[in-house]
From Swiss-Prot:
Family: Belongs to the DRC6 family.
UniProt keyword list: Cell projection, Cilium, Cytoplasm, Cytoskeleton, Flagellum, Leucine-rich repeat, Repeat, Ubl conjugation pathway
Function: Substrate-recognition component of the SCF (SKP1-CUL1-F-box protein)-type E3 ubiquitin ligase complex. Component of the nexin-dynein regulatory complex (N-DRC), a key regulator of ciliary/flagellar motility which maintains the alignment and integrity of the distal axoneme and regulates microtubule sliding in motile axonemes. Specifically targets CEP192 isoform 3 for ubiquitin-mediated proteolysis and thereby acts as a regulator of microtubule nucleation activity.
Domain of life: Eukaryota
Main location: cytoplasm
Chain ranges of the F-box domain: 237-283
Protein known as: F-box and leucine-rich repeat protein 13
Amino acid sequence: MASLRSATPRLRSYFRDKYIPQICEALLCGLLVTCPEDPLKYLEHMILAIIKRGLENLLWDTCIHPSLKSRVRRLSETYLDELFGLDDQLVTPELMIKACTFYTGHLVKTHFSGWKKVAIPRANQEEIMAEKMDKAIAHDNFRCQKYIFNRWFAYTVMSRERLITTLLRLRHLFYMQRQRIILAKWKERARHKSKTREDDLISKHELQLKKWKFKLGKPISLEGSLSDIAVENRRIAFDISVLPEQAILQIFLYLTFKDMMACSRVNRSWMAMIQRGSLWNSIDFSTVKNIADKCVVTTLQKWRLNVLRLNFRGCDFRTKTLKAVSHCKNLQELNVSDCQSFTDESMRHISEGCPGVLYLNLSNTTITNRTMRLLPRYFHNLQNLSLAYCRKFTDKGLQYLNLGNGCHKLIYLDLSGCTQVLVEKCPRISSVVLIGSPHISDSAFKALSSCDLKKIRFEGNKRISDACFKSIDRNYPGINHIYMVDCKGLTDSSLKSLSLLKQLTVLNLTNCIRIGDIGLKHFFDGPASIRLRELNLTNCSLLGDSSVIRLSERCPNLHYLNLRNCEHLTDLAIEYIASMLSLISVDLSGTLISNEGMTILSRHRKLREVSVSDCVNITDFGIRAYCKTSLLLEHLDVSYCSQLTDDIIKTIAIFCTRITSLNIAGCPKITDAGMEILSARCHYLHILDISGCIQLTDQIIQDLQIGCKQLRILKMQFCKSISPAAAQKMSSVVQHQEYNSDNPPHWFGYDSEGNPLDKIHSRVQLRTYSKLIVKEPFSIDEEDPDSKHQ
């Protein structure tokens, strides 16, 4: 061993590089521990195992069986350090002695210090113990204080959060309570204001009713003038002639021809006021009953240079009287519709003397092809021509319009009731009316494709189908009025085609029973709904609330809406209708609207025309709730609502004083007391329908004559308690009257005593009847050019 320690560096390096000490250590340790019977085979087997495992991972106990390995680590790394140790691995004897000395001294010092503390007690042990106890007590107090502080801090944080939450809740409750108080005060003030207004209206109503009853106590002349009957208060004298001339003209423009004649007989001042030429630009003879032919001739001769518009609708004059029209050289508009005495000879005289006519209405007259030949010869500037229900001219007569200079400026031609139409010679026609022409088919639209049509009106045609609208957006891009009534061949596909018309403003699909929610959805999704101002879906019974919801979203400019007999509409649809602030007219007749729906509809305070006819769920409460907020209401139709009583008449008289048209037909509970209140308050009433009001008597005739001076149309059918004599007196006051004293028919829903009949039987017949008398809402777009003369 000593010789190996003193070996050369080369040999020592060889031993270190080839792992000779580790190999020897592992083999020798294995032999010493294992003690095999055949050491050589054991060494051979271990050498092969060492070669297989490699020398880098060789440990001293590699050749020892795991069960024989030592469990306690030795102080020395190897057993052979002393034998084969290297300089950097071996511990020198000097270092070993020094280490043992240090270790022994450390043990002695440690054990001696411990023995010293135990064996030699200190003199101030009690003070030390007291000091330790003080430290322990202080530590324990600190620990307790820390624990308590942590608990207190957590409680304080939680209390603060709870306080903040409570304060926020209290503030929210305070704001809510304050809002409730403010809202309650506002409601109370609004209720008080409304109650004050109602009381004021009721007091005025009672005062006016007293004056009214005072009037009834005086003798009344039915033949008197149209001026008001004097009341107990003295009238203030006022001379109308001191007004500015423009104001006088505006006042007299509202008078009829009969009133003008009456004014001319008041005094010389009034006679002078009506001698202004501008008052005689338009003369309407259709409102006059039993006027002498001499008066007509005299008037036309006197104002022949001022007359621009003449209306003879329904007048029965002799031919020589109509010849006087030829003296009106500046005449521009002439209406002779329904004049059975108007012949081709009359037309010859007019055409020779009035070449400047622009608007000519010859509907329902006996003209023939001779008149059709005169039109292009003399009326070169004719723009609007109505030949509705003139059945004595032929297709050849219609072709005369292109003769000579022709009526090339014609833009409106009404051929309603004319079964054959040829318009290929009139390319400038923009409006076609084919009402009462059931033989027109889809091919007619192809013939009209060369015309720039703006308006189309069809009615009662079963041959028109969806095919006519297939290319309507390309053929008629500027069309704005479509009137397709009772065309049962139209389906949802037609609405899909119509949705592309950007200029459409009026759409009337009355009695198109195959139209449903799907078609309307396609229509409202298109650009056509943006400009739409009037929509009529009467008797389209397949429609539901979803269509109305979509309608309220896509039609911001809609003014007139007719949903009559759409039986699936409920109060939900009414809520969306009430949100359409552009509406001024709505027809909900025959729907399921109830009192709640009428209350919702009362939010819309701009409606002027409302129709809820045949709505069996409506009572006095619903009408009262609506009328109290509808001060602008002008037209109200509550016909066939048999539950209504005089209470609604009183409500209408108090709150709806501007009403001009009222329909209470089929309301058997209305009495003379209600009509007395109506006559005392509603002085602007023009149209009144009381058909089927079996409790009304002759007293209402006197009331209406006194209170409703402007009444023009009165319907009193099935009023058994009104005598023919009273009705005859009233006929001389109004322009149009319908009267009979028969018992109400079964489809009114009640008998002659007002007792209800079988609901199913009466309701079915009433619904059938309502389809026959569908009332078209007023619209400027649907008005004929010469309707203003009618």
